[in-house]
Each structure stands twice: as structure tokens, then as C-alpha cells.
């Protein structure tokens, strides 16, 4: 690698590359979530028959992973670059390897391995065949072919490529700590994110009001259900995301037992499944507008039979 790309140059390079492959460039979704997969741009769009190709950066919050800014590689919040393509291109792995070349990483000169790691997200009823991508011994990407999302079988199959931007940048810039990553010329990652990392860790582990969080979970769950009764998929899903983040805060605080934990996850999953079913039904009512006309008419005719 000749030039060491800054963090923002890595993002710009990936955006341009996947734009050239036909992906829409979406923006980060404005609700807390634990992974880019939970964005409606993946979760909702991976189900149903309509095509969908999108790429976006997603800040992902995982309260239990916070380490007060003292761990060089483990974070309360990290950034993912998410690519979803439906139907999955037959050459998606080749496209991914080409994206590494655009970042200055020649796969022929490095040990790039696809290590089987089937993916599952119990709280959203989602699963798929997957691989971790290891670059010279470090995981930098999760590769998944969705089989089920929101409890629904997927078809056509969606391919998801999730780059861990901090790990990728650490490798490209040859630094041992994420806080030493150059975000932009002259500005280090730690100068932007070290203080919030410490504060969010302190809040998650020591300060958060458990009673308030428990009460909020109940309210968010109830409101999600109420929105679903009215057929309002997107507001309902926003409250599912709020339930998920609230549960993660409770979990980090040690406020839920092992048995309670399973119960909370099941409650979130049940809501997510209803959201998924309702979304597909609403898209059908709209006539699957993202399908080409011939496919749309054929599919709607088949579903009427």
C-alpha cells in the first residue's frame, strides 16, 4: 500500500466503488441500533420480491462493548460500511475483493480468507449463511447471504457485505489503536470519539436509570404494537429499534437476569416478525413498485391465484 487513506477517504472510496456497481448511496438511519443490518434499508428491504441495491455508513452502538476508551479495539460505538444487493450478484465475492484493491489492498499479496461463520440475529428473527473475511489474520468484514429476515424466508436472496471500518482503517494505516487512526488530515479518531466513548461507557455501566429504562421498554413495545395495528410499518419499526437499544442498555447495566434476557429478546423478535409481515403486505398493496412492469404483473397475478 503506497498511500495511507484517511478514515473518511476509505468511506469515500467505498461509496464511489459501490455506486459504480449500481448501489444507491443511503445515509445513516437516525435511530440507535447495534448493527447496520438493523437499519430499515437492510432489514425491511431484504424481504419481499423487490430488487434493492444500497450502500451506507452506519454508526453502531453496543453498550456492553464499551471500555471507557481504554481498550484499543473494543468500542461502545463503531462504524460499519454496509452493502446490500438483492438479488445477490453471482460475482459478489469478486466485487468485494475488487473493493479491497480500490483501498490499496492487493488480495494476491495478502492472506485473505473467507472463514465460515453463519450469522444469526435472534432479536430480529434473522439468519443466513455467512463468512468472516480475515485479512492477514484480522477480521475486517462479515459476508452474509440472508436466508431469513424477520422470521420470513428471503427470496430473491440478499447478499450483505459489512465492513468494520475501524479495523479496516487500523490495518490500512498500520496503527495498533483505533484512537490513533487519522480520520481526516491532522485529526485523529481519538480527538473526535475518545470523550464520547468514555462518557457513554460510564453511563451504560454506572449511571443509567434502570427503572426508567424498564418503563421505557414497556412503553416502546406498546407503541410499536399500536402503530402496527394501524398498519404504520416504519413508525412501528422505529420503536422496535428503540426497544432493542433500551434492552442493550439494560443488559450492559446488569439489570436483566439470564432468564429475563431470553424473554426480552423474544418480545423484540415477535414485534420484528409482525413488522416484516406487515411491510411485505403493504408493498404488495402498492403493487411492488420497484419491480419492472412485466415481473410485477406476473407476480401479482400469481399471488391472486
From Swiss-Prot:
CDD domains tied to this protein: GlyRS_alpha_core
Record lineage: Bacteria, Bacillati, Bacillota, Bacilli, Lactobacillales
Enzymatic class: ligase
Subcellular locations according to the entry: Cytoplasm
Protein name per its UniProtKB record: Glycine--tRNA ligase alpha subunit
InterPro entries, per the entry: aa-tRNA-synth_II/BPL/LPL (IPR045864), Gly-tRNA-synth_heterodimer (IPR006194), Gly-tRNA_ligase_asu (IPR002310)
Key words of the record: Aminoacyl-tRNA synthetase, ATP-binding, Cytoplasm, Ligase, Nucleotide-binding, Protein biosynthesis
Disulfide bonds: none
Organism for this UniProt entry: Streptococcus thermophilus (strain ATCC BAA-250 / LMG 18311)
Family membership noted in the UniProt record: Belongs to the class-II aminoacyl-tRNA synthetase family.
Single GO biological process annotation from the record: glycyl-tRNA aminoacylation
Amino acid at each position: 500500500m503506497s498511500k495511507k487513506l484517511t478514515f473518511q477517504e476509505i468511506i469515500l472510496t467505498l461509496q464511489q466503488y459501490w455506486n459504480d456497481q449500481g448501489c444507491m448511496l443511503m445515509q445513516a438511519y437516525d435511530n440507535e441500533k447495534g448493527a447496520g443490518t438493523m437499519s430499515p434499508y437492510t432489514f425491511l428491504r431484504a424481504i419481499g420480491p423487490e430488487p434493492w441495491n444500497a450502500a451506507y455508513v452506519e454508526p453502531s452502538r453496543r453498550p456492553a462493548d464499551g471500555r471507557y476508551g481504554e481498550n484499543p479495539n473494543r468500542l461502545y460505538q463503531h462504524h460499519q460500511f454496509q452493502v446490500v444487493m438483492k438479488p445477490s450478484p453471482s460475482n459478489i465475492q469478486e466485487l468485494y475483493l475488487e473493493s479491497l484493491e480500490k483501498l490499496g489492498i492487493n488480495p494476491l499479496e495478502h492472506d485473505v480468507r473467507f472463514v465460515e461463520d453463519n450469522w444469526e440475529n435472534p432479536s430480529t428473527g434473522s439468519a443466513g449463511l455467512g463468512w468472516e473475511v480475515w485479512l492477514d489474520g484480522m477480521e475486517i468484514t462479515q459476508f452474509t447471504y440472508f436466508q431469513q429476515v424477520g422470521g420470513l424466508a428471503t427470496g430473491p436472496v440478499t447478499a450483505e457485505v459489512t465492513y468494520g471500518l475501524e479495523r479496516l482503517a487500523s490495518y490500512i494505516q498500520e496503527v495498533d489503536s483505533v484512537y490513533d487512526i487519522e480520520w481526516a488530515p491532522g485529526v485523529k479518531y481519538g480527538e473526535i470519539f475518545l470523550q464520547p466513548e468514555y462518557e457513554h461507557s460510564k453511563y451504560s455501566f454506572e449511571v443509567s436509570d434502570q427503572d426508567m429504562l424498564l418503563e421505557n421498554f414497556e412503553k416502546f413495545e406498546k407503541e410499536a404494537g399500536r402503530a402496527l395495528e394501524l398498519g404504520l410499518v416504519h413508525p412501528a419499526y422505529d420503536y422496535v429499534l428503540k426497544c432493542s437499544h433500551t434492552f442493550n442498555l439494560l443488559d450492559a447495566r446488569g439489570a436483566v437476569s439470564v432468564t429475563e434476557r431470553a424473554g426480552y429478546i423474544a418480545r423484540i423478535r415477535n414485534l420484528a416478525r409482525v413488522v416484516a409481515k406487515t411491510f411485505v403486505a403493504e408493498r404488495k398493496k402498492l403493487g411492488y413498485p420497484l419491480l419492472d412492469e412485466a415481473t410485477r404483473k406476473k407476480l401479482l397475478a400469481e399471488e391472486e391465484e
